[in-house]
């Protein structure tokens, strides 16, 4: 009996030494202080009084909007600074024969990481993911990791960046034999052929005979292919395995059916698995054609995409999968099929969701190269870091089937020989960047490429060395063939930002080059605000150098207002839709975002560009796209029906699957309207009278659907509506609070102050109302209604049972809603 027990213990110890790598979240039990001292890196520093929190965390979003914040309105008018994060931890199963790493998905910015007082490294770029090895300085107990985050020199970004460890952190333990960090590159063709390049590190001091077992699993975890390979790896050497496999009858990854597979790679020493590494991938084919545009799996289609910045509204830059999913789900319902990551590598969660939900992705590296756009931006670090940062982005992301395009930059000033934004304010720089510059030449007589063209080629070469399977582009706002990025002839895909008037010349200027609108539209809208007459299109500002003022700090929710360099939604879509060679577009933007409040300055502090506002309320133009991009029946009538007696009102309607629509006011027809060529809405100009306005859609003489809007009475009560009635522990619930009349109609002019409180296992983590100029804090338990509504975001604690949210307001009946827990 004793012999059996001893054998079991020895076997257990032997097995533990061969256990596979582990990668665990390292987000909890951090300490935080918005202060700076060199002593804070020391493991002996007393941090007992520091704030306790969990990651991801963005300290800027917790602050007040102020005109004096150095980020300026373009950066969201929120504070920056220097802060430290510290975490005390043990490693219960500490093994001297293992290697330990810490992975940061993203820290903004200039993050210096210390372990037990030893500097592991400093990374300037706030949007890149990276890893440090901790092994030499790690102990079994009483470890301290300390991270100094420096976002004090501002402005350094043309939009809201956030501050802090705003993405997830992971603790990784590996055996001496393991798949390298981002060490797989999987390509798969529609006929089922899979090729995998797999890099295996031998960090031991001996030669190792390694067996590599690869297994492909489908979405139901069924094994569909296996193979084994063997190599001898010398000490402290990284070996490359080139593996070929076959899956019979693979299910393809597509927009409609985003089928995913997993390559499970097992590193074996003898018969023992010492490391397991999983890579998600998909089978698909695609190409861009200079005459016919974009093709996916043999199907010609348009890329109906949007650009999005990385913030999550009232949550700031702090990553949460539920909030990203909410953004993508609303865009998917609109018919959007593509995301441009503007203008930086995104959170891994976004790419994972794009894989599983069926979005095409344009993954972008930088907003600037050598030449700065703001005083303290990444251009200061570009020469020292661009090769590593660009390489790391591609290595991290290249297995995602959703990514079909790499972008090496956005509106970089290297398009021109002489272009400089150094002496401009961020607001001026944003405007001039889209206005263009004079083209000059300094190429030598012998045809040598301009230095900016050489840099373009160098960056494309870096991408192609790591991934030759995808096209490379850049978002260019200089449409001339003399653009120095285009002159490099290195870009596979010509990308224009705006300039729809130049698109007709693309086939002539760039023969045999495929084309896509890398950025388009830049229309300006505030949810619920309408400027009439609606057929008067407003440029704001009229020219990029002109000021624009409006005491309301709002923009029209009709599609009749856009920035000086841009165009309306309808006019842009008409060009994209009716030119076969245009592969598609990425609209600026899918969602409003913090910062860049064109055309205004402070107190405006978030953008007007989105199809969906910052709180997640769709603007009316959302339904124009839904009517064009989906097969869903659409009949959207706007604006609301609460005006002054006799006031002349323009009623718009977006619709599809009908020949004509007829408007009625209190039962009296106002006429039948048909869509005109190159227009995507119909309009009636009518005189307001209280009651009901109704629109009826006809097809082949039959009524197919109808909708109506009635005049709302005085505010009577609050109505709470949850987008999701259940929530996982640690998950988010998004709850709309509306001010309604006694009959339940939303009061479109209501601006009541609403107060919120929770009961149970959870907390309020953010409030918003979609206003681009509200000075109210996002981290609060109250919010004014904006055109009759606002948003409350609650987080369910873990473990969770249920959470009640109560809303009240002066002279308003209260409401309560319950969010149940889900597993």
Please identify what each model-predicted range represents.
Residues 95-98, 138-142, 156, 247-260, ...:
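Short glycine/proline/serine/threonine-rich loop/turn segments at secondary-structure transition edges
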């Amino acid at each position: 009996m004793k012999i059996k027990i001893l054998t079991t213990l020895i076997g257990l110890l032997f097995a533990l030494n061969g256990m596979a790598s582990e990668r665990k979240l390292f987000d909890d039990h951090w300490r935080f202080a918005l202060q700076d001292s060199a002593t804070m890196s020391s493991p002996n520093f007393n941090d007992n009084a520091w704030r306790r929190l969990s990651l991801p965390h963005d300290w800027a979003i917790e602050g007040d909007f102020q005109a004096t914040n150095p980020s300026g309105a373009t950066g969201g008018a929120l504070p920056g600074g220097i802060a430290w994060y510290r975490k005390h931890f043990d490693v219960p199963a500490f093994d001297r024969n293992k290697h330990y790493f810490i992975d940061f998905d993203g820290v903004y910015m200039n993050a210096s990481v210390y372990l037990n007082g030893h500097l592991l490294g400093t990374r300037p770029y706030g949007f890149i993911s990276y890893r440090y090895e901790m092994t030499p300085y790690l102990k079994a107990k009483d470890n301290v990791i300390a991270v100094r985050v420096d976002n004090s020199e501002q402005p350094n970004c043309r939009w809201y960046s956030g501050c802090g460890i705003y993405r997830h952190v992971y603790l990784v333990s590996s055996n001496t034999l393991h798949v390298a960090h981002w060490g797989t590159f999987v390509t798969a063709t529609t006929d089922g052929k899979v090729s995998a390049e797999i890099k295996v590190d031998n960090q031991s001091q001996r030669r190792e005979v390694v067996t590599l077992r690869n297994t492909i699993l489908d979405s139901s975890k069924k094994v569909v292919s296996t193979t084994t390979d063997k190599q001898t790896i010398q000490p402290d050497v990284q070996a490359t395995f080139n593996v070929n496999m076959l899956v019979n009858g693979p299910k393809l990854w597509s927009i409609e059916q985003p089928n995913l597979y997993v390559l499970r790679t097992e590193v074996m020493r003898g018969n023992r698995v010492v490391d397991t590494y999983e890579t998600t991938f998909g089978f698909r084919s695609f190409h861009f054609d200079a005459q016919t545009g974009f093709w996916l799996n043999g199907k010609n289609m348009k890329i109906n995409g949007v650009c999005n910045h990385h913030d999550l509204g009232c949550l700031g830059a702090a990553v949460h999968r539920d909030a990203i999913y909410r953004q993508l789900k609303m865009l998917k319902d609109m018919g959007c099929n593509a995301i441009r990551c503007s203008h930086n590598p995104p959170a891994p969660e976004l790419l994972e969701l794009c894989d599983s939900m069926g979005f095409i992705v344009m993954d972008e590296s930088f907003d600037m190269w050598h030449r700065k756009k703001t005083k303290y931006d990444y251009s200061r670090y570009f020469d020292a870091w661009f090769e590593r940062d660009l390489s790391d982005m591609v290595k991290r992301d290249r297995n995602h089937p959703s990514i079909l395009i790499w972008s090496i930059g956005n509106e970089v000033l290297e398009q021109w020989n002489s272009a400089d934004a150094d002496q401009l304010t961020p607001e001026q720089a944003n405007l001039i960047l889209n206005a263009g510059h004079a083209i000059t030449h300094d190429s030598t007589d012998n045809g040598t490429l301009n230095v900016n063209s050489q840099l373009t080629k160098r960056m494309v070469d870096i991408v192609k060395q790591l991934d030759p399977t995808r096209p490379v582009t850049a978002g260019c706002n200089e449409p001339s063939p003399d653009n120095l990025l285009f002159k490099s002839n290195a870009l596979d895909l010509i990308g224009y930002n705006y300039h729809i008037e130049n698109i007709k010349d693309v086939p002539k200027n760039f023969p045999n080059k495929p084309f896509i609108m890398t950025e388009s539209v830049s229309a300006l809208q505030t949810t619920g605000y309408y400027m009439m007459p609606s057929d008067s299109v407003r440029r704001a500002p009229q020219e990029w150098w002109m000021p624009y003022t409006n005491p309301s700090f709002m923009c029209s929710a009709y599609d009749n207002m856009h920035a000086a360099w841009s165009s309306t939604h309808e006019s842009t879509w008409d060009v994209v839709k009716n030119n076969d060679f245009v592969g598609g577009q990425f609209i600026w933007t899918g969602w409003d975002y913090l910062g860049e409040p064109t055309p205004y300055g402070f107190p405006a502090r978030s953008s007007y560009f989105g199809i969906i506002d910052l709180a997640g309320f769709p603007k009316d133009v959302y339904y124009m796209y839904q009517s064009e991009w989906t097969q869903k029946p659409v009949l959207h009538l706007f604006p609301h029906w609460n005006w002054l007696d006799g006031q002349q009102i323009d009623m718009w309607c977006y619709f599809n699957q009908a020949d004509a629509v007829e408007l009625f006011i209190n039962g009296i027809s106002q006429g039948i309207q048909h869509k005109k060529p190159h227009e995507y809405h119909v309009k009636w100009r009518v005189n307001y009278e209280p009651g009901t306005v109704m629109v009826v859609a006809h097809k082949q003489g039959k009524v197919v659907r109808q909708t109506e809007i009635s005049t709302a009475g005085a505010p009577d009560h609050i109505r709470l509506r949850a987008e999701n009635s259940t929530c996982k522990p640690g998950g988010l619930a998004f709850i709309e609070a509306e001010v309604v009349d006694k009959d339940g109609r939303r009061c479109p002019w209501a601006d009541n102050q609403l107060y919120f409180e929770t009961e149970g296992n959870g907390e309020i983590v953010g409030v918003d109302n979609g206003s681009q100029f509200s000075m109210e804090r996002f981290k609060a338990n109250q919010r004014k209604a904006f055109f009759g509504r606002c948003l409350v975001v609650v987080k369910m604690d873990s473990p969770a049972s249920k959470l009640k949210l109560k809303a009240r307001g002066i002279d308003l009946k209260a409401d309560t809603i319950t969010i149940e827990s889900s597993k």
